[in-house]
Amino acid sequence: VLLRSIVNRHTSRIEQTHGLCIHYDKLEMNGLNEIYLQGLSVIPEQRDTLFTLASTRIKLNFWKLLTKKIEVSYIAAEDIRLTFTKQDSIANYDFLFKKDRKVPSQTSGQTVTEINYSERINKLLNLCYGFLPENGQLKQIYITERKDSNFVSMVFPSFIIKENKFRSTIEIHEDTLTRHWKADGELKQSANTLMAKLYSADSTKVSIPYITRRFGAKVTFDTLSYSMTKESNGKNQLYLNGKAKVNGLDIFHKVLSPEVIHLDRGHLGYQMNISDHSFELDSTTTVIFNKIQVHPYLRAEKKKDLWHFTAAVDKSWFPADELFSSLPKGLFNNLESIKTSGELAYHFLLDIDFAQLDSLKLESELKERNFEIVEYGDTQLSKMSGEFVYTAYENGMPVRTFPVGPSWEHFTPLDSISPILQMSVMQSEDGAFYYHHGFLPDALREALIYDLQVKRFARGGSTITMQLVKNVFLNKNKNFARKLEE
């Protein structure tokens, strides 16, 4: 009776706040640490059923209960159904994006407490780890998303947890397509550790559902693994470290590239530090894509509702060919198959303080040592040394192709153009053309400051060199890949 009274009080508050109807057929406590629940349903007002649960039996850690902490040691559940439906503009989950019906009023004498990120995330992770049992079995889990006549369904016939290790098969149904995945891993409450691996049950790649219909994108991979360990020093400082690996990754979206982007091997070994008002990706973090390895540093700090972002990468001397042979296929078409020798080093810094945008720092420096292009790849980068063919585009469509050189009747050599006209073009487009190496970091910095101030892309910082490269070598598709190549 006491258990039902406590549960009813909490569910009643949730019902009033979010406009839900929460019902159960049976709720009882067996002994001091076992709960049995039957016939649970959650139905938003005037909407389709969101969640149903046939039955579940949960065993709690008795000694943790004495310290007012919840830790699940065993769980058994059957027929769990989570269904997201949307018909036209009406969805059974839109309550998640609405303001609560009852908002506690604040008196003028009250002060607003700032969000403590480390404390909030620590509480959330402790809650999640507490609900992850050491042993259990979940049968027939259905997660479905349905919009009009389209749907995606994930079915877990059986999710088994034994001595902290779990495994499951997953059936994916998307409209007329069916796929089969496997998942396994390990979770340890005592060590605050989670490890998981996802891969296909057959020889095909794992294809992420829903995103093709929703975003026009396609993502596939061979295997994906992830691990995370939580540590805390109890002084508003939280540490998350772990690894993420992906093999055989293919990504397609027209905004990224007109071709499929392929990555053979990607690895992230991360160390994240979270304080009461900041997030930091430590410089000990390692990112590996194919053969190249970098150690990025990221920091986001909030002060008086304004953010301060810092990003930095310092890569000491390394063989130049490691970079060019590691570039993902489909992202740098003009550099594919290029062969180089020598060494490169790179430094990058971006520091944006939204409280003082004029203090923005942008540094990017690529150093070379005995660098040479041994063999051109798919694109002859030296073609401007002689006559070449150019295609003019308008609104993404080719309108005219002609040679740039003496064979074209309208070709005019540079020494035949008035020096005054030459100087006028340079001063209006790129006054330091003869004094830089293709980039003007200060121009890019000033353009970025202005764009952030007006909150739109209003000014560019391209030099004549960058515009020349864009027009001669790059395609006319306005996407992320073209900007990276430029």
Language model segments and positions:
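Extracellular/lumenal and peripheral-membrane lipid-interaction modules
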Residues: 1-23, 215
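Preference for short coil/turn "hinge" residues that link or interrupt alpha-helices
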Residues: 13-15, 20, 44, 63, ...
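Flexible beta-edge/linker motif
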Residues: 20, 25-144, 157, 164-199, ...
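Juxtamembrane regions of bacterial inner-membrane/periplasmic proteins
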Residues: 72, 121-133, 152-159, 163, ...
